[in-house]
């Protein structure tokens, strides 16, 4: 290919890859699978390698991160990024509304048009676009001067490197909130704890810590996202209102929270706040309140600013998700990788409608830093963690008999030596045959998202270990009915059901099998990437580090962990024993041209004909996409019993609603 043809193809690839990035990261409705995406990216990389002078700053290949910086330089904001005044109750919101009316000379009965937005709990940033190209990105800082984090922001997949508009503004400063979703946050903390690093306290700290990395390659490995919500300086374009801005910029490629809404009067604001308060627990990211802004930019200019905040906006904060209780015991808990975690057993207390009786203390360094002891009165919080965390000790309530828990010299499960590896915060059991590690490994292997051995719960696994019937996951596939009949209160039918569930699990998808192996740093998503890339266990076992690193989202740490796992002879022997017992993982290809190609489904309510995981698989196998929330882009909502807000929204948007039987009929499955 000559240079002219290469340049044309590079431009085509830019457009195609950017479009797929937008579909994948912003709209959550990919049109191609990861393997097809990787082929496009690899083609672009090869062309740029052949013609390095054709590499442009907005190329999709330039998101991988640059060499580490020694320190961040400073950026002065052309327009200050002011903080917002806070409100904490309805009375203060009524006061805000009345102040605006008085300032504008309006009558008490007049209604202001407001725009209400979920208050994201992340890190505020400013993106500068010059003639449509992203040139500078900075943190809010003190509102006047922030830190230059351009290289890090370039790695955030939801930030366009160039605006999708034919005639872009000469200058456009857009403000937004960089955040980390709850699922990526929990996964990141698991990986950090397994690697011996301190976990992040909450998603906001994780987002801030990820964005303020001097090495942007670290930022690139963390799935940060952004929602844009305001404009700074603007030349060459004009918006008339906040709603005009937020309705326009998604078409330019800038993500906006779909829950933003224009309302009339303070009554509309109150209704929106209470709706978001109810939705808060079901959202895939953290919000800590609602931001309310006067919609009209003319009115905003008339209202102006106070010393540190605008008169035309306010943040109505949610009540904190905290409670006070007592630490009744601190117990060391051994995980499947040998990491020993101190866990606080608490006097039961309700936090955000959930009864809490345990909280992770993460590690001994964290516990000692907070000085948490048995008998302490503490503040606990639910902030993105499945298991709540202890925020602080109320030291003034100490009586003098509180007891700290020292690092155990020996594993509480097997008595093996316990070590703290230099450079890590984790304390680990070195026992190769530690029953706690074996137990947790088998529980993980049999779990619903792994091999899904129906009925094989924790109690049965503990009995198998106690009776010496299993020593590793391969032993599950050599069990006989007589083995289960040794259990307490075990009948013929139940034993046969368990054996049947084990037999059924032999045909699970390759991605589930990879995830079930419990390879360090390999979660469900990475397991799917590996299954799609290599297609068989044999190929994965023999994959080189270079081949692993060529996969999108697989970094050096993950690649090294995979290589280490497959270099362990014991692991290979366990896998071989499973294959000899008839385990045969299958690769389920996403069908191109399936009956659901290009269609988006949402499942809601209590499903009786299939599980949500089964539904997602059925849709994806037919080329469709299963989403978690209803939007204008949703094609079908499948509603089970007691369907709630998703069903209501589907009806409001005119989305077609199906029963479970109607969905199965679309698949050609007979009703029973």
UniProtKB/Swiss-Prot annotation:
Ligand binding (NAD(+)): 34-38, 83-84, 117, 140, 177, 293, 317
EC number: 6.5.1.2
Catalytic machinery residues: 119 (n6-amp-lysine intermediate)
Obligatory cofactor(s): Mg(2+); Mn(2+)
UniProt keyword annotations, A-Z: DNA damage, DNA repair, DNA replication, Ligase, Magnesium, Manganese, Metal-binding, NAD, Zinc
Signal sequence annotation: none
Pfam families cross-referenced by the UniProt entry: BRCT, DNA_ligase_aden, DNA_ligase_OB, DNA_ligase_ZBD, HHH_2, HHH_5, Nlig-Ia
BRCT domain: residues covered: 591-672
MF GO annotations: DNA binding; DNA ligase (NAD+) activity; metal ion binding
One GO location term (cellular component): cytosol
Domain of life: Bacteria
Top EC class of this enzyme: ligase
Residues involved in Zn(2+) binding: 411, 414, 429, 434
Cysteine-cysteine disulfides: none
Gene Ontology terms: biological process: DNA repair; DNA replication
Reactions accelerated catalytically: NAD(+) + (deoxyribonucleotide)n-3'-hydroxyl + 5'-phospho-(deoxyribonucleotide)m = (deoxyribonucleotide)n+m + AMP + beta-nicotinamide D-nucleotide
Function as written in the Swiss-Prot or TrEMBL entry: DNA ligase that catalyzes the formation of phosphodiester linkages between 5'-phosphoryl and 3'-hydroxyl groups in double-stranded DNA using NAD as a coenzyme and as the energy source for the reaction. It is essential for DNA replication and repair of damaged DNA.
Family label: Belongs to the NAD-dependent DNA ligase family. LigA subfamily.
NCBIfam families reported in the protein's UniProt record: dnlj, PRK07956.1
The protein's name: DNA ligase
Species whose genome carries this gene: Geotalea uraniireducens (strain Rf4) (Geobacter uraniireducens)
């Amino acid at each position: 290919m000559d240079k002219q043809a290469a340049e044309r193809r590079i431009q085509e690839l830019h457009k195609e890859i950017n479009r797929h990035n937008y579909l994948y990261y912003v709209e959550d409705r990919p049109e191609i699978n990861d393997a097809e995406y990787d082929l496009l990216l690899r083609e672009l990389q090869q062309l740029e390698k052949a013609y390095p002078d054709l590499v442009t700053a907005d190329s999709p290949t330039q998101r991988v991160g640059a060499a580490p910086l020694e320190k961040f330089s400073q950026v002065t904001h052309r327009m200050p990024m002011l903080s917002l005044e806070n409100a904490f109750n309805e009375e203060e919101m009524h006061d805000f509304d009345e102040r605006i009316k008085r300032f504008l000379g309006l009558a008490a009965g007049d209604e202001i048009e407001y725009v209400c937005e979920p208050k994201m709990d992340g890190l505020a940033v400013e993106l500068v676009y010059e003639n449509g190209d992203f040139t500078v990105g900075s943190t809010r800082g003190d509102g006047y001067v922030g830190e230059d984090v351009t290289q890090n922001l370039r790695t955030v997949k939801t930030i366009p490197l160039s605006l999708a508009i034919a005639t872009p503004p000469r200058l456009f400063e857009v403000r937004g909130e960089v955040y980390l979703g709850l699922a990526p946050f929990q996964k990141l903390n698991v990986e950090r704890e397994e690697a011996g690093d301190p976990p992040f306290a909450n998603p906001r700290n994780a987002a801030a810590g990820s964005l303020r990395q001097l090495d942007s390659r670290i930022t690139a490995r963390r799935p940060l996202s952004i929602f844009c919500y305001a404009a700074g300086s603007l030349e060459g374009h004009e918006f008339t209102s906040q709603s005009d801005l937020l309705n326009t910029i998604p078409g330019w490629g800038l993500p906006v929270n779909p829950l933003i809404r224009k309302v009339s009067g303070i009554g509309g604001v109150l209704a929106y706040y209470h709706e978001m308060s109810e939705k808060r627990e079901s959202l895939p990211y953290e919000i800590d309140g609602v931001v309310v802004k006067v919609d009209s930019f003319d009115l905003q200019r008339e209202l102006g600013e106070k010393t540190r905040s605008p008169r035309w906006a306010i943040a109505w904060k949610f009540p904190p998700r905290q409670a006070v209780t007592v630490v009744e015991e601190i117990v060391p808990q051994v995980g499947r990788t040998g990491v020993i975690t101190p866990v606080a057993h608490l006097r039961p207390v309700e936090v955000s409608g959930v009864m809490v009786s345990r909280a992770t203390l993460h590690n001994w360094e964290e516990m000692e830093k907070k000085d948490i002891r048995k008998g302490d009165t503490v503040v606990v919080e639910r902030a993105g963690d499945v298991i709540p965390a202890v925020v602080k000790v109320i030291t003034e309530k100490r009586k003098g008999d509180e007891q700290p828990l020292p690092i155990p010299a020996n594993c509480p499960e097997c008595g093996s030596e316990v070590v703290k590896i230099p450079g890590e915060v984790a304390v680990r059991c070195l026992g190769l045959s530690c029953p706690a590690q074996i137990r947790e490994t088998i529980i993980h292997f049999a779990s619903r998202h792994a091999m899904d051995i129906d009925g094989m719960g924790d109690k049965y696994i503990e009995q198998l270990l106690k009776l010496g019937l299993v020593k590793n996951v391969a032993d599950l596939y050599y069990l006989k009915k007589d083995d289960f009949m040794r259990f307490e209160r075990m009948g013929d039918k139940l034993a046969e059901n368990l054996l049947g569930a084990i037999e059924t699990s032999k045909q699970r998808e390759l991605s589930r099998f990879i995830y079930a192996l419990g390879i360090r740093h390999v979660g469900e998503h990475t397991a799917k990437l590996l299954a799609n890339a290599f297609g068989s266990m044999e190929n994965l076992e023999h994959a080189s580090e270079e081949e692993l690193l060529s996969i999108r989202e697989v970094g050096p740490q993950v690649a090294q962990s995979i290589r280490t796992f497959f270099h362990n002879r014991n692991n290979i022997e366990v896998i071989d024993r499973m294959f000899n017992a008839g385990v045969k993982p299958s690769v389920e290809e996403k069908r191109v041209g399936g009956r659901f190609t290009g269609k988006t489904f949402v499942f809601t309510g209590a499903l009786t004909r299939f599980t949500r995981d089964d539904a997602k698989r059925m849709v994806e196998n037919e080329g469709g996409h299963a989403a978690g929330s209803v939007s204008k882009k949703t094609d079908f909502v499948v509603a089970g019993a007691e369907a709630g807000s998703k069903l209501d929204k589907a009806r409001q948007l005119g989305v077609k609603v199906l029963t479970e039987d109607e969905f199965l009929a679309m698949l050609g499955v007979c009703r029973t």
